[in-house]
Amino acid sequence: MAPSGPGSSARRRCRRVLYWIPVVFITLLLGWSYYAYAIQLCIVSMENTGEQVVCLMAYHLLFAMFVWSYWKTIFTLPMNPSKEFHLSYAEKDLLEREPRGEAHQEVLRRAAKDLPIYTRTMSGAIRYCDRCQLIKPDRCHHCSVCDKCILKMDHHCPWVNNCVGFSNYKFFLLFLAYSLLYCLFIAATDLQYFIKFWTNGLPDTQAKFHIMFLFFAAAMFSVSLSSLFGYHCWLVSKNKSTLEAFRSPVFRHGTDKNGFSLGFSKNMRQVFGDEKKYWLLPIFSSLGDGCSFPTCLVNQDPEQASTPAGLNSTAKNLENHQFPAKPLRESQSHLLTDSQSWTESSINPGKCKAGMSNPALTMENET
């Protein structure tokens, strides 16, 4: 356990303040770009009224979407595992008293028995977080900066001072998209005035510095943002997170880098949702609850197709993809309604427990 006291508390407060420096930098840069473009370029330097109106209208639309998506990415709290993944007080007490042997493993085995988890550690053990004292849901990871387990964690982004995960990944993608469009639009409309100032085609004024530096900044950020946005578009198309791209998820049958991929269309809908009218808006519309995800690994993992006794559940082929026969959340089940039927006559849809875990699995702790 981390040391406590006045000194450590002061250090934590200091770190929390320092973590906001990148966000303050982006905010100040955005504020300056507004002044440089809207005032110095459009109002001061542009002489054509029609050009002014068109540029200002398009600019303010992109500016508003940029700020909205950035705000949502920063201030949307990451989702943490629900209470069913936490150990009970009795189980925690047993873990503290028992050595790391068979008795210790049996506690974890019983706790994970009915949870909808299919990923494992590299050694094939249940993924357990000592720090949070919980069994990690699939695609959940512990963030050392936030000191929490984050559902479908992608990465911790210093530019938003927040973890990017299930609750705000769509907002992060839109933030990248609108910031890229914002920079490209500024660079494209500023180019002719940049050339005129560079070749002394316009008189030296206060606007010269702002317009020339604005073009350099917009062009530079366009290059970096285009590569980052392109990379995350590829991740979405494969239904991967940044962490899963660097280290493929491990399932019961072994490692599979495409274990969560359902095909391009369904992968897109996992992040953006079923209603396309919300795709371009920073409004949460992702499918599922962040605790369980459909996979395509039933054929390789017979346990994933198993159900508790008394349940009449089946899993059928959907465009050559197989899904675990477990109850899905209402929004998540939309992925399967086109050509796959689910029989859930005895399943309580309000819970996210299903499936049976292999009692012979070796249990280990993972932080």
Curated annotation (Swiss-Prot):
Region feature (Disordered): 330-367
Cytoplasmic side: 1-16, 76-170, 230-367
EC annotation from Swiss-Prot or TrEMBL: 2.3.1.225, 2.3.1.-
Transmembrane segments: 17-37, 55-75, 171-191, 209-229
Record-annotated DHHC domain positions: 127-177
Domain comment quoted from the record: The DHHC domain is required for palmitoyltransferase activity.
Protein family per UniProt: Belongs to the DHHC palmitoyltransferase family.
Protein name, per record: Palmitoyltransferase ZDHHC2
